[in-house]
A protein has these predicted regions:
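N-terminal secretory signal peptides that target proteins for export/translocation
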Residues: 1-9
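Short beta-strand->alpha-helix linker/helix-N-cap micro-motif
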Residues: 31-107, 115-132, 158-169
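Mid-sequence helix-capping/hinge segment at a functional interface
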Residues: 32-37, 44, 139-186
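Structural preference for beta-rich elements and adjacent junctions enriched in aromatics
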Residues: 175-178, 183-616, 622-624
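Exposed, low-structure sequence patches enriched in small/polar residues
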Residues: 572, 660-949
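Beta-propeller domains
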Residues: 597-678
Length: 949
């Protein structure tokens, strides 16, 4: 059985509003005074209409009358009357009325408390139960009404002092497997009272809940609280929005611009609804657009693609723990493309997280519609049936470069990153989530294929192989999840996109394997919120963990690609487990994985352990600790460990402080094994400043992490001035930035890197961007460096400068991408570079081509060389759940041409079929006879099936 009750207390503000709105026509007869300690109870209405059930209404009213009289609330009289008018004649301020409905042997009773002085419903409760337990059900109605009246009557007990007994959950009918595109979903029996008040469990960071039928309430600061509506009918997920709920429940329509005109109304209307039933959260929206469909930016259906992020789209994020830091996001465009992301610490979105959910879209004369269905079992939340969540709704109108929110974040995080400012989200109340589900998921897989490896010893050709394994997910509690994997296989994962590396440091590649993606943000170390815009006029030189604005030099203490991969060779994962979630104010994560041996990579069987705990403090800050262990070190006999403690603080809208202290234990390296960092960020819209000090000692070696460079002490500062000129209609914002990076050896103190940058850029109103920067470098090579074939630079100091110009084509254009031209010095020589990166050309709504080209000509006194990187991706999306992707890459640095062809079909939510072909060829023979020599290739078919219990 479920139970819901709402409380709305009268206060001085409400009383004043009532007094001001009472009609006071001259000569009108004065209404009789209503006593605040008198209650009238009227018979409850029989919604079901069955004559046999007619006696129930009088029985409920009689029990309520008697129960309230002996409740202990300071009431002078509780009288049963025939109707509300009779109660008013008795001078009763409060009238209790209601209804009941019967479905089989189940009974639902809804009771409302109305203030006769205003006619407003100020509280409501709903109780479900079996007809056989009718007397106990009546007692629970009384127990639920007592705290409502206690909060209204002077001298009464507080509304939180009395709670009705928790009901039992009724048996739920088994859900059918997904069928055709339009799928009905079960809903609860029709509710009688659309104006049910909301009960909340917790403190709301915003205005009070809206009083039904209103669904949104704003305060003077613009903060919003939204009320979710329980469905009273079956909802068919078809994107048409033709159910009666969309006509009877008010829409959330007062969206607000964040960009380009902060605080202004949107230029196009958006209506949204937040609905739920016993199994799912539903988000529906009607997206009005005065332009014809041919002008909409809707040209991608592939799940989680970068282009989908740039289309006209509609987003919802839910902060299910209401911690104002972490959330999950779901979005779609007019074509029904699906996108989702897990947001950690107000930034760092993980768009490779793929929960089970569904979406359908439609079109109407004047716009498009979207319906999302998000199962509660795909979410993690605090225990208890009544919830307070954070919620944000956003619409992106790409052709106008316009972003509108239901609760807009500060403009300093304008553009796409604004959706990740979780603390700016509205509050969601009124949800009733299922209780008691163990939430067990079992996902077995089978795989088979052929492989050829001519680089192996001995070479192999067309070797057949097959395998099977299983992943299991178990909800320990509603907010703590255990994952187990056995015989894990990642053959379906797309290959990495190659990068040009003209530095002497390692490249960083993101994790793409599904098992390591869910809950990955919990293991992030010393990563603060995204305070400002993603965009910068400065060149992001290098890669790796840490803040990209700071150059990516901070170590990543846990880097999951160290598990199951070694020197480019796949190492088999025998099995393992992970526990992630939230316990009170603590984020917790524990990971243990066991890998097999791999002779080709020289790796023995190894066990990996990672433990993470993080404590939320203040409003948006945290303290944490991380531990990693590798049972077999790569650098000596024995195990290696890393320990770290970190703190992230966020103040006001745009101030952040981050710090950490970490230590590693590596065989044979007992000293000089510390790393620590302190960083300050101020990121307002018009100005920005960052200062950082980072130390990585010589023997600090996180063997389950990532380290771009070692043995250094770094001091880094940057400043930004970014005005928005009102006198230039074509310019949205200028950015003038400068930075200074000073790196010296941690042990000797000698200078190794000194870099100064100055950059200027402009964002145009049509979303194009143009930029120009100048870089002055000093590098001291402590060992010889070979940037290209036949060229080895000797030890010594080098000073060199270069300039770079960029132009990024905006989202409104058919062809998008960034053109880059660079010229200047390179160590003791010269460099000329040209590139066209992240380009995309849609041929149709389903077919697109994504080319990227990077060409570099380098000439030094020791010789000249050229590096070419050409990447071409072809995408064909059959439906939002089935797509083909072909990726071809030519990299002259390692003389290879590689191909990766993938077909992915999600034939049922969470269940997939993959067909993958990969190939790598030697390109040295390419020049004389236009042929290539095969290195390796593979063909696999993998199928998995998700079972949810």
């Amino acid at each position: 059985m479920t139970e819901r009750r709402g409380v709305r207390g009268s206060d001085a503000v409400l009383l004043l509003a009532v007094l001001l709105t009472v009609p006071a026509a001259v000569g009108a007869q004065e209404a009789p005074a209503l006593a605040t300690d008198r209650v009238a109870v009227v018979p409850f209405d029989n919604i079901s209409g069955s004559v046999d059930d007619g006696w129930l209404g009088a029985g409920i009213a009689e029990t309520v009358t008697a129960g309230l009289s002996g409740s202990g609330v300071a009431l002078r009289s509780v009288t049963r009357v025939l109707d509300a008018a009779a109660g008013e004649q008795l001078g009763a301020r409060w009238v209790v009325s209601g209804s009941y409905q019967r479905l089989g042997d189940q009974l639902r009773v809804t009771a409302r408390v109305r203030d006769e002085s205003t006619g407003m419903v100020v509280g409501a409760v709903t109780v479900d139960g079996a007809l056989a337990g009718f007397f106990a059900l009546q007692d629970r109605v009384v127990a639920a009404l007592v705290p409502v009246l206690a909060g209204l009557v002077p001298g009464g007990r507080g509304p939180d002092e009395v709670r009705a007994p928790a009901p039992e959950a009724p048996a739920r009918a088994a859900r059918e497997q997904r069928g055709p595109p339009a799928r009905p979903r079960p809903a609860t029996p029709p509710a009688a009272a659309p104006e049910r008040a909301v009960r909340t469990a917790g403190v709301i960071d915003g205005p009070p809940p809206p009083v039904a039928p209103a669904v949104i309430n704003r305060d003077a600061e613009g903060r919003a609280t939204i009320r979710a509506t329980r469905l009273t009918e079956v909802l068919t997920l078809d994107g048409q929005l033709d159910e009666s709920v969309y006509a009877t429940v008010p829409a959330i329509s007062d969206f607000i611009q964040q960009m380009p005109d902060p605080g202004a109304p949107p230029t196009e209307k958006t209506d949204a609804w937040i609905l739920f039933d016993e199994a799912n959260l539903y988000v529906g929206a009607r997206i009005w657009d005065s332009a014809p469909p041919s002008e909409w930016i809707a040209n991608e259906m592939r799940r989680d693609s970068e282009q989908l992020f740039r289309n006209d789209n509609f987003w919802v994020i839910v902060d299910t723990f209401y911690d104002r830091r972490n959330a999950v996001a779901f979005f779609s465009n007019a074509l029904g493309g699906m996108g989702d992301a897990a947001i950690t610490n107000e930034g760092n979105p993980n768009r490779d997280w793929n929960p089970v959910w569904d979406v359908r879209t439609g079109r109407f004369e004047g716009g498009w519609t979207v319906e999302m269905e998000i199962p509660f079992r795909s979410l993690r939340y605090r225990p208890g049936p009544d919830q307070i969540w954070g919620i944000q709704l956003r619409r992106n109108l790409a052709r106008k470069n316009e972003w509108v929110f239901v609760s807009p974040p500060p403009i300093s995080v304008g553009g796409g990153g604004g959706i990740f400012r979780v603390s700016a989200a509205a509050t969601l109340v009124g949800l009733e989530v299922p209780e008691g589900s163990k939430n067990l998921e079992i996902k077995p897989y089978g795989i088979g294929g052929l492989s050829t490896n001519l680089a192996a010893t001995p070479p192999t050709r067309n070797v057949g192989d097959g395998n099977a394994g299983v992943d299991v997910k178990y909800g320990i509690t509603q907010n703590l999840t255990a994952d187990f994997t056995y015989n894990t296989d990642f053959a379906q994962v797309e290959v990495d996109e190659q990068q040009v590396n003209l530095t002497r440091f390692s490249l960083f590649f993101p994790e793409k394997r599904e098992f390591f993606l869910e809950g990955a943000g919990i293991f992030d170390f010393a990563r603060g919120a995204q305070l400002g815009s993603f965009y910068t006029a400065l060149r992001r030189i290098g890669a790796g963990g840490g803040n990209p604005m700071g150059g990516g030099n901070a170590p990543t203490l846990f880097y999951s690609r160290q598990i199951g991969l070694q020197r480019g060779t796949v190492v088999p994962i025998v099995g393992g487990g992970r526990v992630t979630g939230k316990v009170g104010d603590f984020d917790v994560g524990f990971l243990n994985i066991h890998t097999g041996d791999e002779a080709a990579a020289g790796v023995a069987m190894t066990n990996f352990t990672v433990a993470r705990v993080k404590r939320d403090i203040l409003r948006r800050s945290s303290l944490g600790a991380l531990f990693t262990n590798r049972s077999v070190s790569l650098l000596g006999d024995g195990a290696s460990q890393a320990y770290g403690a970190d703190a992230t603080f966020a103040f006001f809208e745009n101030v952040g402080v981050i710090g950490y202290l970490a230590k590693t234990d590596t065989p044979g390296r007992a000293d000089k094994n510390l790393s620590y960092q302190g960083r300050f960020d101020y990121a307002a819209d018009r100005y920005g400043v960052q200062a950082e000090h980072l130390v990585v000692e010589d023997h600090f070696i996180p063997e389950v992490g990532f380290l771009r460079r070692d043995n250094f002490r770094r001091t880094y500062t940057t400043g930004r001035f970014s005005p928005r000129p009102r006198s230039l209609d074509s310019i949205r914002q200028f950015r003038l930035e400068g930075s200074f990076d000073y790196i010296e050896a941690a042990d000797t103190g000698s200078v190794e890197t000194r870099q100064s940058q100055v950059g200027v850029s402009a964002e145009l109103e049509n979303s194009d961007r143009v930029g120009f920067n100048v870089v002055d470098n000093y590098e001291f090579l402590v060992r010889p460096f070979t940037p290209g074939p036949g060229v080895t630079l000797p030890v010594g100091g080098y000073r060199f400068q270069d300039v770079e110009a960029t132009y990024s084509l905006g989202l409104q254009r058919r062809l998008t991408g960034t053109v880059t031209v660079r010229a200047g010095e390179y160590f003791n020589g010269t460099i000329r570079s040209v590139g066209f990166m992240r380009a995309r050309l849609p041929i149709t709504e389903q077919f697109s081509v994504e080319p990227s080209v990077s060409l570099n000509w380098i000439d030094t006194p020791l010789g000249a060389f050229r590096t070419d990187l050409v990447v071409a991706r072809v995408n064909y999306t059959f439906t939002p759940r089935m797509f083909f992707s072909g990726l071809t890459q030519y990299n002259s640095a390692n003389s290879t041409v590689s191909n990766n062809l993938r077909l992915r079909w999600e034939y049922s939510p969470g269940s997939e079929l993959f067909v993958v072909y990969t190939e790598a060829r030697e390109t040295d023979p390419l020049m004389p006879d236009r042929s290539t020599e095969l290195r390796n290739r593979g063909f696999v078919v993998k199928v998995n099936r998700l079972f949810r219990f």
